[in-house]
Amino acid sequence: MCDFYARFEEYCKTPGVDSGKARSYANAIEYLCDYLEICEINAQGIAQIKSLENDICDKDSELYQDLLHFLTVRGQKSYLAKGYIKAALKYFFEFVK
């Protein structure tokens, strides 16, 4: 998985994509995968993330609140609270096409 996150970070730095937040977006996807217990980025993992995208972005959803608690315990809540996970998903789905 470390290789995937490194490649995703590099993708976020490429001209035309250049998110300006490559490291933060790679971390955001890593932390989301940790929460979802996704150990390999494959079709199943991508589909799982895609199916939960609305709940991940909805502050009123049970999943959002549970993810926020998970990240808070790990000292990483800003990745969700400040919108890094939501923003990273756009780049993630483009990257895994």
What is the predicted role of each segment?
Residues 17-97:
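Non-catalytic DNA-binding core/recognition domains of DNA-processing enzymes
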